[in-house]
């Protein structure tokens, strides 16, 4: 980043190669929308170049980059109407039964993550999917380390509750309205 800050624009390509996948995953886990995530990644790297002089050498680049990412996302939300649709590209109402168990679990986890309130989803994505340290997250969010720990704990608890409800709903849909093992209309056990 020091070379980009010093005016060596070619080094931005190196930063892009190093960080664009992580940024895309960050945005995609927050929004569930592929095209929006790609646009936001481009916007972040444009801003890194534009605001390169604001980077303080010796501070964590990743924390600075994720702060820019948060700002880019907030700016996008402000530009759009207040009731932006954050519907994921895959419907959570249907979990394909022919998927392997691990794929179904991953689908339910993604769905549960998108069901979390935005603030809780963001802190989980930063800590669990982007592997940032709590100290870095505190810097990004502008809060105390202890606050980050509490937020992560509460977000994990709520994620677990949502996941369990989704999993229970999947089992109910699989069993049907009569319950497991009962054929509709026959009263006999299958």
Predicted regions, residues:
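Sigma70-family region 2
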Residues: 5-6, 32, 43-60, 79-81
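A short pre-motif secondary-structure segment
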Residues: 123-127
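N-terminal module of bacterial RNA polymerase sigma factors
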Residues: 1-22, 114, 176-190
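Hydrophobic-face residues of short alpha-helical interaction/recognition segments
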Residues: 23, 27, 52, 65, ...
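Short, charged helix-capping/linker segments at alpha-helix termini
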Residues: 3-14, 24-43, 145
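DNA-recognition helix of helix-turn-helix
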Residues: 70, 74, 120, 141-168
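Internal acidic/polar
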Residues: 75, 82-106, 177-187
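C-terminal edge and immediately downstream basic/flexible tail or linker adjoining helix-turn-helix-like DNA-binding
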Residues: 3, 87, 108, 139-142, ...
């Amino acid at each position: 980043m020091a070379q980009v800050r010093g005016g060596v624009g070619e080094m931005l390509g190196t930063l892009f190669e190093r960080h664009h996948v992580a940024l895309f995953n960050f945005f995609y886990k927050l929004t569930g929308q592929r095209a929006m995530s790609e646009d936001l990644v481009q916007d972040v790297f444009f801003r890194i170049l534009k605001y390169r002089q604001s980077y303080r050498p010796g501070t964590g680049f990743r924390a600075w980059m994720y702060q820019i990412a948060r700002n880019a996302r907030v700016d996008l939300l402000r530009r759009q109407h207040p009731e932006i649709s954050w519907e994921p590209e895959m419907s959570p109402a249907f979990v394909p039964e022919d998927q392997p168990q691990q794929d179904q679990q991953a689908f339910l986890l993604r769905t549960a993550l998108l069901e979390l309130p935005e603030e809780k989803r963001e802190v989980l994505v930063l800590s669990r999917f982007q592997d940032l340290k709590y100290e870095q997250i505190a810097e990004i969010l502008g809060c105390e380390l202890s606050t980050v720990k509490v937020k992560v704990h509460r977000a994990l608890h709520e994620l677990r509750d949502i996941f369990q409800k989704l999993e229970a709903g999947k089992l109910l849909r699989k069993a049907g309205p009569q319950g497991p093992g009962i054929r509709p209309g026959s009263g006999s056990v299958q």
